[in-house]
């Protein structure tokens, strides 16, 4: 028999190569999304809706994939339907004027959103009654419901920022602002951790995360926030430099928490990335993890402080 050549493992990419891949993927993806938001023509709203629906669908697919890898039963189709229904109905309520007759105030938009979730949740319970299995009844409902909240409900705050009724045309600028500040937090944390990281922060969850990286993430997000507001303050209703400093710190910290929460899900499911769509990033949830918790924080700050 001929000698078999020993197989060699693929060489591990350097940190600089991974960083470059991550940077290129992030810039290209968010440039497409932002271009759709600022296209300034009749189809821009529909492009925005299409992107939101695509992110919701892919994010829920990945989340339910991870839960099923843990052996948990989930109503996948109903969960995805609920996520798309929530995003689509909120869009028509805010952007297409379905809420105009009652006044599109933030509280009323929240009531509308809650109504959709309640109706969907009742349908989820009926599904469980129809397909009852004693051992997994509780987990099937809870896991399906949590997927809707974690992906679709949190992501829906981006729409509520974009179409916030009390800030004239500032909504897209606030969406752009919180996305850029959050992503600079991610990149700042990665760079600081790679260059200066010595002290592990959460070795059981994400061994690569360090306290130096966390510090860099917050510092860079604050700097990015101040620079953005300095140049575009005239486009952002109610925003001042002091708010930029505070929001930069809040969004930087929340981005870290969002990243760690997704790491908990991935480690619990035994996967490295939630998907493999984007070089250097992974899946949709790897792209969105730090944004999911920052979207509601940005909305709440906008509603209760900047426009109060």
Regions found by a protein language model. Name each.
Residues 23, 63, 187, 260-263, ...:
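Generic detector of well-ordered alpha-helical packing
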Residues 182-194, 254-267:
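Short helical (or helix-break) motifs at transmembrane helix termini and adjacent helical loops
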Residues 265-266, 289-298:
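C-terminal transmembrane helix pair
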Residues 249-257, 284-292:
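Hydrophobic transmembrane alpha-helical segments of multi-pass transport and channel proteins
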Residues 2-249:
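Membrane-embedded alpha-helical bundles of polytopic integral membrane proteins
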Residues 301-308:
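Juxtamembrane boundary at the C-terminal end of a transmembrane helix
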Residues 268-290:
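Interfacial loop-to-transmembrane junctions
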């Amino acid at each position: 028999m001929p000698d078999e050549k020993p197989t060699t493992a693929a060489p591990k990419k350097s940190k600089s190569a991974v960083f470059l891949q991550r940077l290129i993927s992030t810039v290209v993806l968010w440039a497409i999304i932002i271009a759709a938001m600022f296209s300034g023509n009749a189809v821009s709203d529909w492009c925005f809706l299409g992107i939101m629906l695509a992110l919701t669908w892919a994010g829920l697919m990945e989340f339910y994939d991870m839960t099923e890898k843990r052996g948990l039963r989930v109503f996948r189709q109903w969960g995805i339907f609920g996520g798309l229904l929530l995003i689509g109905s909120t869009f028509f309520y805010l952007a297409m004027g379905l809420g105009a007759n009652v006044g599109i105030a933030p509280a009323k938009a929240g009531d509308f959103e809650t109504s959709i979730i309640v109706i969907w949740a009742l349908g989820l319970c009926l599904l469980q009654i129809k397909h009852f299995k004693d051992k997994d009844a509780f987990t099937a409902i809870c896991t399906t419901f949590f997927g809707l909240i974690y992906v679709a409900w949190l992501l829906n705050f981006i729409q509520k920022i974009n179409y916030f009724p009390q800030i004239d045309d500032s909504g897209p600028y606030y969406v752009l602002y919180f996305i850029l500040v959050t992503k600079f937090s991610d990149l700042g944390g990665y760079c600081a951790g790679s260059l200066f990281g010595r002290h592990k922060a959460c070795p059981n969850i994400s061994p690569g995360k360090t306290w130096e990286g966390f510090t860099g993430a917050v510092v860079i997000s604050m700097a990015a926030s101040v620079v953005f507001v300095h140049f575009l303050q005239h486009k952002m209703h109610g925003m001042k430099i002091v708010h930029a400093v505070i929001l930069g710190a809040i969004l930087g910290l929340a981005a870290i928490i969002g990243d760690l929460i997704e790491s908990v899900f991935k480690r619990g499911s035994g996967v490295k990335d939630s998907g493999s769509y984007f070089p250097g990033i992974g899946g949709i949830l790897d792209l969105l993890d730090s944004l999911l918790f920052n979207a509601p924080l940005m909305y709440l700050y906008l509603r209760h402080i900047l426009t109060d």
